[in-house]
Regions:
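N-terminal core-entry segment
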Residues: 1-96
Length: 96
């Protein structure tokens, strides 16, 4: 929870315009928490974060701007992005 609060405290979010998505807040917070809990390397944290960004942006682009009229894409695509980042750290395959 502390990572999530810290990632949003300055209200200076990154944005991917095509996905209408703020990836850093939803990817780095859970990835950092899991990396700390596992004692993972910085390289593992970064590669997991890249996986989270890739998945979140692709899902956000798939959902499109019409999705944003009703839902906040960071909350919807972000849950999948967070799962991808943490899953990467855990060594899960896409099926898992």
């Amino acid at each position: 929870m502390a990572n999530a609060a810290a990632s949003h405290v300055a209200e200076q979010d990154d944005v991917h315009n095509g996905a209408v998505f703020h990836p850093a807040t939803v990817v780095f917070s859970p990835a950092l928490a899991m990396a700390q809990a596992m004692g993972a390397s910085g390289k593992a944290l970064l590669t997991a974060s890249v996986a989270g960004y890739e998945v979140g942006i692709r899902v956000g682009e798939f959902l499109g701007r019409s999705h944003y009229k009703v839902f906040h894409t960071t909350g919807t695509a972000g849950t999948i992005a967070a799962a991808a980042a943490v899953g990467h750290l855990l060594g899960l395959n896409p099926t898992q």
